[in-house]
Amino acid sequence: MDFNRTKGLKKDSDFRKVYKHGKSFANKYLVIYILKNKSDYSRVGISVSKKVGKAITRNRVRRLIKEAYRLNIDEKIKPGYDIVFIARVSSKDATFKDIDKSIKNLVKRTDISI
């Protein structure tokens, strides 16, 4: 998930740290957890549970989230945050437009926008 200013959040321990100590915001399709880190870049992780559907569906939702983030958010957030997006079950029927709108809404509600 290497975008211009973002790296991937990969380790389970990193995800757990963000869940435990981070702030969360939610809407119909997604939940976002945000935690300030001590680096000069942001890290993003995406979690899609098996409750969402089979592998094809989960991967589709993951791709939609990645693309919406890449197109709209990557350049517009302050560096130095760990961000985790969690897809809700309702996201399996969502279109790209729905996910895109959802991500924009969540980021606007947080204080990570430039």
Curated annotation (Swiss-Prot):
Sorted UniProt keywords: Endonuclease, Hydrolase, Nuclease, RNA-binding, tRNA processing
Top EC class of this enzyme: hydrolase
PROSITE patterns assigned: RIBONUCLEASE_P (PS00648)
InterPro entries listed in its UniProt record: Ribosomal_Su5_D2-typ_SF (IPR020568), Ribsml_uS5_D2-typ_fold_subgr (IPR014721), RNase_P (IPR000100), RNase_P_CS (IPR020539)
EC id: 3.1.26.5
GO biological process: tRNA 5'-leader removal
A single GO molecular function term of this UniProt record: tRNA binding
Catalyzed reactions per annotation: Endonucleolytic cleavage of RNA, removing 5'-extranucleotides from tRNA precursor
GO CC terms of this entry: ribonuclease P complex
NCBIfam families: rnpA
Subunit structure, as described in the record: Consists of a catalytic RNA component (M1 or rnpB) and a protein subunit.
Family, as annotated: Belongs to the RnpA family.
Purpose of the protein: RNaseP catalyzes the removal of the 5'-leader sequence from pre-tRNA to produce the mature 5'-terminus. It can also cleave other RNA substrates such as 4.5S RNA. The protein component plays an auxiliary but essential role in vivo by binding to the 5'-leader sequence and broadening the substrate specificity of the ribozyme.
Name the record gives this protein: Ribonuclease P protein component
Upper taxonomic lineage: Bacteria, Bacillati, Bacillota, Clostridia, Peptostreptococcales
Name of the gene encoding the protein in the UniProt record: rnpA
